[in-house]
Amino acid sequence: GYSSADAVITDCISNIKALSTKYNCDVMVVETGMECADDNGKLASTSVLNEGKRQLARILKECKENTNGRCKGVFYWEPECRPSQYRLGAFTEGGYPTVIMDAFK
């Protein structure tokens, strides 16, 4: 289904198009991140991690295909952070990438 995160992504892409047109400039998405930890600082459930991958894949696809070529890249902020360190990282407590990072494949 359509989530509040989907609405945020839709709005983000609209803003990229509007700003790049208004200011005639290229843009980048920086400091994006997906939920990888639960409220206790433990690795989130498989379904939460898969949803993060889906959202990140959508951001990457939309930025590449739906910004009239004006979005020049997407940075994931601190993906190497472990769940106990940062809720929006993308690695396990053992230091391995979660499925979220597969969105970049």
Walk through the language-model features, giving the residues of each.
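Aromatic- and acid-rich polysaccharide-binding/catalytic face
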Residues: 1-17, 21-36
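Aromatic-rich peripheral "rim/lid" segments of glycoside hydrolase catalytic domains that contact
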Residues: 11-14, 18-21, 37-58, 62-105
